[in-house]
């Protein structure tokens, strides 16, 4: 890594810090948010107390009725839960709804989807890829009866009703003669989207007259599906979309919770490559989202949502929801918005973490189309990444060439810079030395900063690719050379023993592509520092920092996707080849002659150069005064 690259990274860091600093909330906003959270917490606490009372009451009823005769039990349940008493007793059974890509199991207890498997995918150890099962999920609506009893649908037994449509099933909760609550699930062929409709019939005297919404509780554990637990956990997030607005998410790195006062279009429980999304046409209101990080075990995070969904007590209109159980594949998620107005678009493709701002734009309109186009003809993704790297290098060639020419100019002027250093030795003549060097560069038509701008312009593509490769589900379970899966690390050596500091940050393995990337970066750094030595004095520690960066990348990327480290390895190799070609094809004698000719031409100073020289003169005067003050002492 050369000095220009390091400066580019530092500039990006400064921009990110400045953006965060100027967009931080004001004290007034923080105080308003605190008051809002306090009020929500009080309401939530009261609701939890009431819910706990109802749960305790239900548990006591079940315990006291367990040994009673069926007739007596039915009578007692009728007294405690009214028309819902009969639905409190039953035997759990399951109805399967499936197509070629998804298998779902719907339990008659709660009338909910309790199992979801993606047929076209497996886990990292070749087991069926199950998003969740009955023990890892909960989906419940709280019902308030006309007699002010609180009943949970998760405690009630529904009756499956099969209609004429083989792709649909109705889970019916009977509440009396001509009165029932229907949950209808419809799964079309080859579709990951499940239509979910809630419709009540004759519930006017069953539910409370004020009922115009149902309170939802949705919980799910996110399983580990990939080989690298720590790396996968970085991409496990609870996402949500505002109505006709942007997509946001809770913290990826720690437990998090948030109350959302605005209506939400959808809520998504996202793993690294797969998601479970609940969508509402009318929107979710009074939503509370909770994400709990699990440090060890097969579960990465536990997600929880409480929200309110509209419900028509008169039964004239159904509540229309949808589930998405499927992969985080950009083209697939984008297809759900085809032919849909901008206000109604789901924006599910934003579940794929492609970066923000210009980086996402580069991925969406350049990287992904190029990747998909090459994928139509090349099925070996190692070869595809190689060709993609070459294409990117060709596109960036003009910027790379300009950067190298700037370095070449600095290099051929090095003897003259060394003469200036000899003429103005010591720290006390630093300003004279700097001024003379800048005058030399200005007269010759060279600029130390001209090599930084091309490198900075390349950064959006380089960072976009850094975001793209770990998120590309196409690389999942795709092998190349010794790497069995390009979506995770390619360990050539591993161990089981926990080693303090090393295991948490480096892992219990060594990734070969990451190691090769580090070696090539160290070689390129050494070679490039020799080639770009301008004779000027470097900042203290700069050389050590240049060598430390590749070693830091070894630690940082060791647990990353091998597809990404393979790309960086190939990219650095191509850069080395380009540098060698530039080195031996550019005639430095002719270049020096051209620069000497520039020095003889009258040059009009730019406004920037004038301001730079004025600043240098001011610094020189300040330094002179400081030195005189020291002599007087």
Swiss-Prot record:
The keyword ATP-binding does not apply. It comes from the Bacteria. Pfam families: 60KD_IMP, YidC_periplas. One of its GO terms (cellular component) is plasma membrane. Gene3D superfamilies: 2.70.98.90. One of its GO terms (biological process) is protein transport. Signal peptide: none annotated. This is Membrane protein insertase YidC. It comes from Parabacteroides distasonis (strain ATCC 8503 / DSM 20701 / CIP 104284 / JCM 5825 / NCTC 11152). The lineage of its organism: Bacteria, Pseudomonadati, Bacteroidota, Bacteroidia, Bacteroidales. The gene is yidC.
